[in-house]
């Protein structure tokens, strides 16, 4: 019998392998390689938003109060966009605008770019987290694919749209009332509700809500009779592996209701994935179009006839007048640096007035 004496054949681990072992170790909160992007970015985005809504004014950028310190509440506080004069500057704390002065940086709107970019990369990190965990447990990456929808909307609205305009100033501020104002701005300046990409987005989101409600109700409807009571939560364990509802019964039910029904669970759930994600992506594509001021539907013939005939008016022409009113009021308020003045006689009036 021969005994081999010498070095072990096992090679010492390198830095990458050691980091990989530590990052992907089984723990209560999985970290992973994606966590190197997700956790710092999410921390800074949320921390920047809480700091801004609590302490930072928008007086120097919008002429507004926007913090709890100034008397705002949860619905009216916001981290507002930088001034229009700062264009597309990244507004780095150490950049030429703030020159390392934290107070001045906050006054100029530096927290907005800070929250926007850390938020975008945080969302991307969360998508990568879903991909990484799915790969480690041998799942398909459809969760990560689905999450590209919210990422596309965030990036298109908060980053691409203002990049197509004159500056970050025209992006939404990070606050409830601030985003509502941005929605009104989108309608007044882009007639967004008549844009077919917006229509597809609405169909996707509301259609997904309808599908979700129908699916949940159908599963509850077809639960096996496994106890004496009518209560859904009796006679079964919430963690059990066995199914407690009948797909065949659900299929019969919807075949009677509509005449058609999903033939298998895979097609049903793919459809529930496809509808909202496609809607979100279509709305994101539409916002990218608005970034370069693409028009959607303009029914000019109706506008000309309404201008010539006092008795002719449609819901479209009324909405066009409403948009003109939004622009007339919003432009002067939102862009005081332009010194816009609209005389009373040029403000829009409908034929009914």
Curated annotation (Swiss-Prot):
Topology relative to the membrane: Multi-pass membrane protein
CDD domains: Photosystem-II_D2 (cd09288)
EC numbers for this chain: 1.10.3.9
Highest taxon of source: Eukaryota
Key word Lipid metabolism present: no
GO cellular component terms listed in the entry, alphabetical order: chloroplast thylakoid membrane; photosystem II
Binding site for chlorophyll a PD2: 198
GO molecular function: chlorophyll binding; electron transporter, transferring electrons within the cyclic electron transport pathway of photosynthesis activity; iron ion binding; oxygen evolving activity
Residue numbers binding Fe cation: 215, 269
Residues annotated as transmembrane: 41-61, 125-141, 153-166, 208-228, 279-295
GO biological process: photosynthetic electron transport in photosystem II
PROSITE patterns named among the record's database cross-references: REACTION_CENTER (PS00244)
Modified residues (Phosphothreonine): 2
Keyword hit for Acetylation: yes
Subcellular location: Plastid, Chloroplast thylakoid membrane
Main location: plastid
Binding site for chlorophyll a ChlzD2: 118
Cited function: Photosystem II (PSII) is a light-driven water:plastoquinone oxidoreductase that uses light energy to abstract electrons from H(2)O, generating O(2) and a proton gradient subsequently used for ATP formation. It consists of a core antenna complex that captures photons, and an electron transfer chain that converts photonic excitation into a charge separation. The D1/D2 (PsbA/PsbD) reaction center heterodimer binds P680, the primary electron donor of PSII as well as several subsequent electron acceptors. D2 is needed for assembly of a stable PSII complex.
Other facts: 2 of the reaction center chlorophylls (ChlD1 and ChlD2) are entirely coordinated by water.
NCBIfam families assigned: psbD
Family per similarity comment: Belongs to the reaction center PufL/M/PsbA/D family.
Subunit structure: PSII is composed of 1 copy each of membrane proteins PsbA, PsbB, PsbC, PsbD, PsbE, PsbF, PsbH, PsbI, PsbJ, PsbK, PsbL, PsbM, PsbT, PsbX, PsbY, PsbZ, Psb30/Ycf12, at least 3 peripheral proteins of the oxygen-evolving complex and a large number of cofactors. It forms dimeric complexes.
Name of the protein this chain belongs to: Photosystem II D2 protein
Annotated organism of origin: Chaetosphaeridium globosum
